[in-house]
């Protein structure tokens, strides 16, 4: 829905409101025309029902308006004598249209000085809960949102189980684009695991003014651009288009801003030709292959615990150990431990075996295919098979196994997956440790389009900026017109995790559009070891040293938890003293 369509929708709703209420405006001593003027009619209605005019501001806030509108409908009915429980329920169930019935068929009286307080304790409680939910939703949507780190892509900078506060206003609060949605939840409703929103209608993208721009090395929360799963981390081939603001929330480090050039060479990150120097708090990790001495005596789990390495490891056939996440400090600790003969970073220099999608003919005999998939999964893993959908993914399939699968009659189609951006055969020699140069698009900047660079910008043109793109040989058509250039409509960013060999980031799916930006993590209020890989006791899993620490800044994070406890104790002491003083004064009276 574009802006003009949205304005027309607002006018239609305003007209419907006028048709349903103009006689009630007359009974309240107002003019009939006042019911027909958009926005102004709502302000007048607030005067009629004796409620604050700022309620009208809430009416225009997506999601919040779903909470305030039923309240306004009920208050309007009560103002004109319709105070029964049945009246209130009918008003809500009919989406306020019951007011139109009252407007034309009922001889009601305007009660200008009615009792505003709810008639029963139950209604009073319901009203209090409703406004508490409105306030919480307002804060959650436009100011601060709680967030939990779900994966180890930023380990050890941010840990799995860090409970964050994410600021919406640092980069400018984005208004919800999906107006019909359950408050205080994201894309699914907890427990029942059902979709929490209606995909249509959609509101045009709008962002309030920002306190600051996104800078290089900022940690940023954003909506995962290529998210097409029904729910976060769902293991299914079935795809579903999701609105921007209902795509899964990701958190990464912004290493490249609009206009930058990104190059990764032998795992080293270069921006605009210069080696990136990350903030002191960042803990970049890589995967290493470690060869221990034959006579070394150690417990691998205890060793990793001492290194605070919380990612996984793999013991290989030659007795070497692949440790998936080590910092430079960890590497030096191992080198000085006297336990190892050799340690080397796992760098992907050449094209590795590809992943493949097999489309399976469910109408033919597929026993051989299923047996081959089962044997492969049992012997080496890396197989996803959905029989109902007739599709399978086999990860890291070498040429010999690929040719064997192609001989099965049950295989209708074989598609390679090029996992590194821009995900095409032409750039299949790029890896997560060696790629680029990639130019990050900037709003308003024009580029020359060719069939060679089009893979980098195809998704921007079609998915993010919603143009029709057709390619016929060397001819490129956008919205039906031949062209050799394109001007970007918004800014884009390059996001990467600090845990470089265990992070799904821009190296795999490309640029993050500006309209996908959610906010800036600013504060860790609690941290709990969700994975518990070292089998700690329950209380030991609380990482109290991380309680009440800031996300950004220089030097080691300082916990403000003790100061919070002091303030909390002071508050309770003051409250106890105040209560005791009041009781003493009452006794004297």
Predicted regions and their residues:
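Membrane-helix interface segments in multi-pass membrane proteins
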Residues: 1-13
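Hydrophobic alpha-helical membrane-embedded or membrane-associated segments
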Residues: 10, 14, 18, 39, ...
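Soluble "head" domains of membrane/secretory-pathway proteins
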Residues: 118, 160-589
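Internal/C-terminal transmembrane anchor helices
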Residues: 116-145
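Cytosolic-side transmembrane helix boundary signature
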Residues: 91, 95-127, 207, 247
């Amino acid at each position: 829905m574009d802006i003009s369509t949205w304005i027309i929708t607002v006018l239609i709703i305003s007209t419907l409101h006028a048709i349903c209420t103009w006689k009630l405006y007359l009974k309240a001593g107002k003019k009939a025309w006042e019911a027909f003027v958009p926005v102004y009619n709502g302000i007048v209605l607030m005067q009629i029902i004796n409620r604050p005019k700022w309620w009208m501001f809430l009416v225009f806030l997506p999601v919040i308006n779903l909470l305030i509108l039923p309240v306004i409908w009920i208050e309007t009915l009560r103002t004109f004598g319709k105070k029964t429980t049945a009246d209130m329920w009918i008003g809500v169930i009919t989406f306020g249209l019951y007011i139109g019935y009252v407007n034309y068929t009922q001889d009601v009286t305007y009660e200008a000085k009615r009792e505003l307080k709810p008639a029963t304790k139950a209604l009073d409680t319901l009203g209090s809960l409703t406004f508490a939910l409105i306030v919480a939703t307002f804060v959650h949507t436009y100011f601060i949102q709680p967030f939990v780190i779900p994966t180890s892509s930023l380990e050890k900078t941010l840990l799995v189980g860090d409970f964050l506060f994410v600021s919406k206003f640092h980069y400018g609060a984005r208004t919800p684009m999906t107006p019909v949605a359950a408050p205080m939840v994201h894309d699914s409703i907890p427990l029942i695991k059902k979709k929490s929103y209606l995909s249509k209608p959609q509101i045009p993208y709008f962002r309030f003014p920002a306190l600051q721009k996104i800078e290089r090395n900022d940690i940023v929360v954003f909506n995962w651009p290529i998210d097409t799963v029904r729910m976060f981390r769902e293991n299914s081939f079935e795809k579903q288009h999701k609105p921007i603001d209902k795509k899964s929330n990701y958190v990464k480090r912004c290493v490249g801003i609009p206009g930058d050039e990104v190059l990764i060479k032998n795992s080293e990150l270069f921006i605009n030709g210069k080696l990136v120097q990350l903030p002191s708090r960042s803990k970049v990790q890589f995967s290493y292959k470690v060869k221990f001495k034959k006579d070394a005596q150690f417990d691998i789990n205890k060793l990793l615990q001492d290194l605070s390495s919380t990612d996984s490891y793999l013991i290989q056939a030659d007795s070497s150990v692949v440790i998936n996440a080590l910092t430079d400090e960890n590497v030096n600790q191992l080198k000085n431990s006297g336990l190892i003969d050799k340690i080397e970073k796992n760098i992907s220099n050449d094209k590795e075996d590809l992943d493949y999608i097999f489309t399976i003919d469910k109408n033919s005999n597929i026993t051989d295919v299923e047996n081959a998939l089962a044997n492969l999964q049992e012997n080496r893993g890396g197989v996803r098979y959905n029989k109902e959908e007739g599709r399978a993914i086999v990860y890291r399939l070498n040429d010999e196994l690929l040719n064997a699968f192609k001989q099965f009659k049950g295989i209708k189609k074989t598609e390679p997956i090029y996992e590194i951006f821009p995900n095409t055969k032409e750039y299949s020699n790029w890896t997560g440790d060696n790629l680029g140069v990639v130019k990050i698009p900037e709003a308003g900047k024009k580029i020359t389009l060719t069939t060679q660079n089009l893979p980098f910008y195809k998704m921007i043109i079609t998915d993010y900026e919603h143009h029709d793109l057709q390619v016929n040989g060397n001819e490129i058509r956008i919205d039906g017109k031949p062209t050799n250039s394109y001007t970007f409509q918004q800014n884009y960013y390059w996001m990467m995790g600090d845990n470089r060999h265990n992070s799904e980031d821009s190296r795999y799916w490309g640029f993050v559009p500006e309209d996908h930006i959610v906010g800036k993590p600013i504060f860790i209020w609690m941290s709990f070891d969700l994975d518990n890989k070292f089998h700690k006791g329950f209380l030991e899993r609380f990482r109290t040293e991380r309680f009440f620490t800031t996300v950004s800044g220089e030097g080691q994070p300082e916990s403000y938890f003790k100061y919070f406890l002091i303030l909390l104790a002071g508050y309770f002491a003051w409250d106890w003293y105040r209560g005791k003083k009041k009781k003493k004064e009452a006794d004297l009276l």
